Regions:
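N-terminal nicking endonuclease/strand-transfer module with a His-rich metal-binding environment
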Residues: 1-125, 129-188
Length: 188
C-alpha cells in the first residue's frame, strides 16, 4: 500500500514562511552524494516555477491550510522497478483531494506544487505542498491513500504487461540480450 503522509500549517506569517521553506526543500534537497540538486516543480497545470509557487502561497485566502504531502509507493509491490510515472500518481492523489474538498461545498480550487524525489533514496517519492480550504479528516486521508495505492497498482499491472509482451516478442523474434562488459572482456 502506498504511503501518503500529511502535515499542515495554517496560512499566516509563520505558515506562509514554512510553506515557502517547504517549496525550497522539495526543489533543492541534496541527493545521495549530498550535492544540491535543482528538481523541476510541477502543479496541476504542468511545470511551475518557485516564484509561481510563492505567489499562490502569498495569495492564499483566509482559512487556507498548507498541507505538506509525501506520496511514497510501496517499493516491493507497486514500484518494484522504480518505473512508475510519479507525476501521474501525484495528479490522481491531488484529484482525490480536490473531490473531497468539493464535496464539502468548497469552490476554491486546491492549488499545489510538487517535485519528484528519485535521487537520494531507493524509494521514489513525491513531495507536494497544497493550498487547501476545508478539512481533511482521517477517513479522507484513508480515501486518499486508497486512491493512490489503486493508481500505483494499476500502473504496475500495465507496466508489467508491457514488459511481458516485449519479452515475448523478443523471444519470438529470436532476439538475444547484448553481452555484458564482463562477457565481452572474456570473449564468451
Amino acid at each position: 500500500m502506498a504511503v501518503v503522509k500529511t502535515h499542515f500549517e495554517r496560512r499566516g506569517k509563520v505558515g506562509n514562511a514554512k510553506a515557502k521553506a517547504n517549496v525550497r526543500y522539495i526543489q533543492h534537497r541534496p541527493d545521495k552524494d549530498k550535492e544540491r540538486v535543482m528538481r523541476p516543480l510541477f502543479g496541476s497545470e504542468g511545470p511551475m516555477t518557485r516564484l509561481e509557487a510563492y505567489q499562490f502561497i502569498d495569495d492564499a485566502p483566509k482559512g487556507t491550510k498548507f498541507f505538506t504531502i509525501i506520496i511514497n509507493p510501496d517499493p516491493e509491490k507497486e514500484d518494484t522497478h522504480k518505473d512508475l510515472d510519479m507525476r501521474a500518481i501525484t495528479m490522481t492523489t491531488m484529484q482525490t483531494i480536490e473531490e473531497i474538498i468539493t464535496a464539502q461545498g468548497i469552490t476554491t480550487p486546491v492549488i499545489w506544487v510538487a517535485a519528484v524525489h528519485d535521487d537520494h533514496t531507493d524509494k521514489n517519492h513525491v513531495h507536494v505542498l497544497a493550498s487547501v480550504q476545508g478539512r481533511l479528516d482521517k477517513p479522507d486521508l484513508d480515501r486518499i491513500r486508497e486512491a493512490t495505492t489503486k493508481a500505483c497498482l494499476e500502473q504496475r499491472r500495465e507496466l508489467d504487461r508491457a514488459l511481458s509482451r516485449q519479452a515475448q516478442e523478443q523471444k519470438r523474434d529470436g532476439w538475444e540480450p547484448e553481452p555484458t562488459l564482463e562477457e565481452d572482456a572474456w570473449g564468451d
